[in-house]
Swiss-Prot record:
Belongs to the Rho family. GO terms for biological process: DNA-templated transcription termination. Facilitates transcription termination by a mechanism that involves Rho binding to the nascent RNA, activation of Rho's RNA-dependent ATPase activity, and release of the mRNA from the DNA template. This is Transcription termination factor Rho. ATP binds at residues 200-205, 212-217, 243. One of its GO terms (cellular component) is cytosol.
Length: 457
């Protein structure tokens, strides 16, 4: 171990000393991540300036590769970043979230010796200086490792494996409440969630949703609340088997990492993307970071696993293979609060009432695995009341660890008041009360003491 640490220190020292050689001007340093974020039109303009031929026939990844190669020929320095995928042969590639972790010509090769030296695993976010392909090579290669998971590379060597970390109930609240300055009922969705099913860091939550009940908008509102109130949280939105226009809408409305696999892609692609996302999240949690993954939808992910898993010969009701749900359950079960720092929160949607027996079986299998549930009601949505949350059927386990005792008592009083009502009347009643206040604290101030619950509001 001492020898390994010595080699690691020498490597880091070499990295620092080598950073000084080739003193390029600022405009000669190309950031690969920023380059990939550019629009195709902007890349074409840059390619024309570099006098690259046949631009119109190149895909975006091929265009990025051509720009990088030409820039290196003209004396440029390239700094790249990506998420490591280690292949069975021992070497790996840095995949880019900008292209949904698809393999492409602009991926960065990492040698087996570098992977061993820094203790890297699939899912590690690696940043460093890269070099152009030599004669006979196809890919750019990592020259120096500057950071691993946004920290010093030496820290990656001493981290504890995710499976060895101790899981606990969530005990730190994930703030979702946003002040309301309009009377648009959609604005109250996160406030309603705070009242009926508060979320904590490390929560494993299911949004149970029939079709057309506003689950996508609800996810967008949750994502916006998380990025606004919890800037320390690393947010990933994972869209599986989704419509392309919904992907674009989510990318433009969410300030976080949005990765997707659309319905026209094979099931193996859905699975590969989900595995990359969960491995990346685990590596960040090992570095004591708080990560939130919003998944739309867990049901479609389970369908994809059912397609790619080798047949066991045992088929359950609805055509679900007996072994198909083990891996999506492992994905969902990775959500946990970690003792001594770090958490992984997963909020996923489960589809019901789709007319598919398979979807019902998948939902029943996942039903008891979460520790928080938000149930959407089709009857409420048909009345165009949003959020279409069924208050009486929604809730969080061990909510007393997340909410102050006085507030918790008032939340229970609220539940006793709305319990005799129907689901539609309950949400209408609550929204009407929330319209008169900007925050939930102000709403609770309107409530009288818990001794008289029937006249509480």
């Amino acid at each position: 171990m001492n020898t390994t640490n010595k080699q690691l220190t020498e490597e880091l020292n070499n990295t620092e000393s080598n950073n000084d050689h080739n003193d390029f001007a600022e405009n000669n340093i190309i950031n690969l991540k920023q380059l990939k974020r550019k629009l195709p039109e902007e890349l074409q303009v840059q390619a024309e300036e570099l006098k690259i031929e046949n631009i119109s026939s190149l895909l975006k990844q091929e265009l990025v590769f051509a720009i990088l190669k030409k820039s290196v020929e003209q004396g440029g320095l390239i700094v790249g970043e990506g998420v490591l995928e280690v292949l069975p042969d021992g070497f790996g590639f840095l995949r880019s979230p900008e292209v949904n972790y698809l393999a492409g010509p602009d991926d960065i090769y990492i040698s087996p010796s570098q992977i061993r030296r820094f203790g890297l695993r699939t899912g590690d976010t690696v940043e460093g200086q890269i070099r152009a392909p030599k004669a006979g090579e196809r890919y750019f290669a990592l020259l120096k490792v500057n950071r691993v998971n946004f920290e010093d590379p030496a820290k990656a060597y001493h981290r504890v494996h995710f499976d060895n970390l101790t899981p606990l109930y969530p005990d730190e609240k994930l703030g979702l409440e946003l002040e309301n300055n309009s009377k648009d009922s959609k604005d109250f969705s996160t406030r309603v969630i705070e009242l009926v099913a508060p979320m904590g860091k490390g929560q494993r939550a299911l949004i149970v949703a029939p079709p057309r009940t506003g689950k996508t908008v609800l996810l967008q509102n949750i994502a916006h609340a998380i990025t606004t109130n919890n800037p320390e949280v690393f947010l990933i939105v994972l869209l599986i088997d989704e419509r392309p226009e919904e992907v674009t809408d989510m990318q433009r409305s969410v300030r976080g990492e949005v990765v997707s696999s659309t319905f026209d892609e094979p099931a193996s692609r859905h699975v590969q993307l989900a595995e990359m996302v969960i491995e990346k999240a685990k590596r960040l949690v090992e570095h004591k970071k708080d990560v939130v993954i919003l998944v739309d939808a867990i049901t479609r992910l389970a369908r994809a696993y059912n397609t790619v898993v080798p047949s066991s010969g045992k088929v359950l009701t609805g055509g679900v293979d007996a072994n198909a749900l083990q891996r999506p359950k492992r994905f969902f079960g990775a959500a946990r609060n970690i003792e001594n720092g770090g958490s992984l929160t997963i909020i996923g949607t489960a589809l019901i009432e789709t007319g598919s027996r398979m979807d019902e079986v998948i939902f029943e299998e996942f039903k008891g695995t979460g520790n928080s549930e938000i149930v959407l009601d089709r009857k409420i949505a048909d009345k165009r009341i949003y959020p279409a949350i069924d208050i009486t059927r929604s809730g969080t386990r061990k909510e007393d660890l997340l909410v102050d005792k006085i507030i918790l008592n008032k939340m229970w009083v609220l539940r006793r008041i709305i319990d005799p009502m129907g689901s539609s009347e309950a949400i209408e009643f609550l929204l009407k009360k929330l319209e008169n206040t900007k925050t939930n604290c102000a709403f609770f101030e309107m409530m009288k003491s818990p001794e008289r619950p029937r006249n509480g509001l």
